[in-house]
């Protein structure tokens, strides 16, 4: 029997050949999809230890500059914890589904992110319809006519959001406040009891966080307002700026494609063409738990964060010239 002549998908795919099916791309990454429960616990415990140590330092240190520095680094660590929760929400943190839900909720607490609401907005909408205008709501581009139809305040905000200087403001207002923190029916038509419970959970954590900082300030004879600024507001705003920047650069690059036609969007292989791999010096990508190796994540969401670097390298080896770096 004569073998069928099919493209060799075990070798790099030239640009003049069709992109293989997503199933094939995922098969390349199967060796990198193994998840470790013990590693998940170590990552979560380590980052929480960093978070609590830095928040404590914002109260215990005397110099304002030192408080500010610790507050900003605490915000960065909130981002690291969020990436762990992000993995849990994708079921890529451990092999255990229910454990992932618990660990994800724990990891999301410092970012005040309700787990189930984020799961719906991110897993169902963003990953299900990445860069499909009218469905995916993250950094959706506007036509000139759509921009002109905005109110003066909305125009001002859009200019600020897209200036490159205020991605944190965008995330805080458009994503966290409108869609993740007791969203109204306009932004979240689906209503589930778990949405309310998860929102209440992060409120309780936030209240306890504020109360602990205020009590520590009183106990040490410091300004309560300064302590809250350095120990709560600065970390939270830094975190929003960090995640806002991450999403901004992932989905607004000039080479990233957006579509308003579902058929064209499907044909464009959106899991490859709608995001970028942003590289940094000094191992900053590793310090961010490799969330910037984003193409690999969109191709296969089951890849754990500690294997994304290898997965991204494999895709770039097999798909030369197709991945935006």
Predicted regions and their residues:
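Short, motif-level signal for alpha-helix interfacial/capping segments enriched in acidic residues
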Residues: 24-26, 59-72, 129, 228-231, ...
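Cytosolic juxtamembrane amphipathic/interface segments immediately preceding
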Residues: 26-35, 188-189
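Alpha-helical bilayer-embedded segments of polytopic membrane proteins, i.e.
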Residues: 34-81, 111-113, 158-173, 191-246
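Membrane-embedded catalytic scaffold of the fatty acid hydroxylase/desaturase
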Residues: 78-85, 89-199, 255-325
């Amino acid at each position: 029997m004569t073998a069928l002549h099919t493209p060799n998908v075990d070798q790099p795919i030239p640009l003049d050949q069709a992109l293989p099916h997503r199933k094939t791309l995922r098969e390349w990454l199967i060796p990198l999809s193994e998840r470790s429960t013990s590693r998940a616990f170590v990552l979560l415990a380590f980052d929480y230890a960093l978070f609590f140590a830095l928040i404590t330092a914002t109260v215990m240190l005397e110099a304002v500059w030192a408080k500010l520095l610790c507050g900003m680094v605490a915000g960065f660590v909130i981002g690291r914890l969020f990436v762990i929760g992000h993995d849990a929400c994708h079921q890529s943190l451990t092999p255990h589904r229910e454990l992932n839900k618990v660990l994800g909720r724990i990891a999301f607490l410092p970012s005040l992110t309700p787990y189930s609401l984020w799961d719906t907005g991110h897993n169902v909408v963003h990953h299900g319809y990445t860069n499909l205008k009218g469905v995916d709501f993250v950094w959706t581009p506007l036509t000139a006519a759509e921009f002109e139809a905005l109110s003066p305040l909305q125009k001002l905000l859009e200019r600020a959001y897209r200036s490159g200087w205020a991605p944190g403001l965008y995330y805080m207002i458009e994503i966290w406040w409108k869609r993740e923190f007791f969203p109204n029916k306009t932004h979240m038509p689906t209503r589930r009891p778990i949405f309310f419970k998860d929102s209440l959970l992060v409120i309780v954590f936030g209240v306890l966080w504020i109360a602990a900082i205020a009590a520590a300030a009183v106990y040490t004879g410091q300004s309560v307002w300064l302590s809250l600024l350095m120990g709560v507001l600065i970390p939270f705003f830094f975190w929003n700026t960090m995640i806002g920047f991450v999403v901004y650069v992932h989905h607004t690059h000039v080479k990233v494609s957006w579509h308003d036609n579902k058929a064209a969007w499907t044909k464009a292989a959106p899991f490859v063409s709608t995001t970028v791999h942003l590289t940094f010096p000094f191992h900053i990508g590793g310090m961010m738990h490799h969330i910037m190796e984003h193409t690999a994540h969109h191709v296969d969401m089951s890849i754990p964060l500690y294997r994304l670097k290898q997965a991204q390298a494999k895709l770039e080896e097999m798909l030369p010239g197709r991945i935006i770096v």
